[in-house]
Design a protein with these regions (language model features):
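A residue-level detector for the "anchor" residue at the start of short, highly conserved motifs
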Residues: 6-266
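Core hydrophobic alpha-helical transmembrane segments of single-pass membrane proteins
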Residues: 1-5
Length: 266
């Protein structure tokens, strides 16, 4: 595993207007790959969307509950309304809050759904579960749920136990380092224009690079997919990023327009 750390800046801070979604009465906020955006919902809640994300919600937003559906990654700073819970629906879980700040990551191509709580409290439950079965998170906790386990009862996994079928079908609650500033934390690095990766194999990292730089990455052979990287990028162009990766671990690549072909150096 190789560590790469590069300083700089890369961010689009656009106020993204909502557009009409395919479903009648529903609106959508969308970010393309290579950009991030901030939006203000009708209730005063602020949402930051990471690259390649979509947020759907009812256009009146005046019901008994405030419900949104997320595909991708977003940070929510929810305005407290005691009698109107704010609910985020993802592909695997629902997150129910009153007023709080938290991050949710649920890209369709990712293996896990993750939510990290920074302020307040949240309840996490499967779509069909009642509130009585919800998992409570407190600040500085992160819940990680494999998507393959989304239809199974939520049960806490012990990270120190050997891998097993039962554990793989469970969620994990991890504690994040509360001594670090929010700008220094792994889970919210993207809010501060920093792409961080920890122990990612090249195939996993490629998905993040595709979203960050708006490129398409192809692997010419399977061998190179297993290379592991650890580090961060900010201001670097995609060309510079690949040069740093190549300097850490030898491999070949070719960039043509927005397409990148990667192959083994051996």
């Amino acid at each position: 595993m190789v560590c790469i750390i590069v300083a700089g800046w890369f961010w689009k801070n656009d106020e993204q207007p909502a557009v009409e979604a395919e479903k009648p009465g529903q609106e959508m906020i969308m970010t393309q790959n290579g950009s991030r955006t901030r939006s203000l919902l009708a209730d005063g809640t602020t949402v930051w969307l990471n690259a390649g994300s979509k947020l759907f919600y009812e256009n009146d937003f005046n019901g008994a509950t405030r419900e949104v559906r997320l595909e991708g990654e977003a940070f929510f700073d929810v305005v407290k309304q005691t009698n109107r819970p704010f609910i985020v629906h993802t592909s695997g879980i629902d997150i129910r809050v009153l007023g709080t700040a938290f991050n949710v990551k649920s890209y369709p191509e990712d293996k896990n759904v993750e939510t990290t709580l920074y302020r307040g409290r949240v309840q996490v439950l499967r779509h069909e579960d009642s509130i009585s079965k919800a998992i409570q998170l407190i600040p500085n906790q992160k819940l990680i749920l494999p998507k393959q386990a989304a239809n199974e009862p939520l049960k806490l996994s012990d990270e120190n136990k050997p891998s097993s079928k039962e554990i793989s079908a469970s969620f994990i609650i991890a504690h994040i380092d509360s001594t670090k500033k929010e700008s220094e934390r792994f889970e919210t690095a993207w809010l501060y224009s920093r792409l961080e990766f920890r122990g990612d194999n090249f195939e996993e990292l490629a998905k993040k690079l595709e979203r960050w730089y708006n490129v398409t990455i192809f692997f010419a052979d399977e061998k190179v997919k297993s290379l592991n990287f650890n580090g961060s990028f900010e201001r670097e162009t995609v060309e510079q990023a690949f040069k740093y990766l190549q300097a850490a671990i030898p491999f070949n690549y070719k960039i043509e327009n927005n397409e990148i072909s990667v192959s083994s150096s051996q």
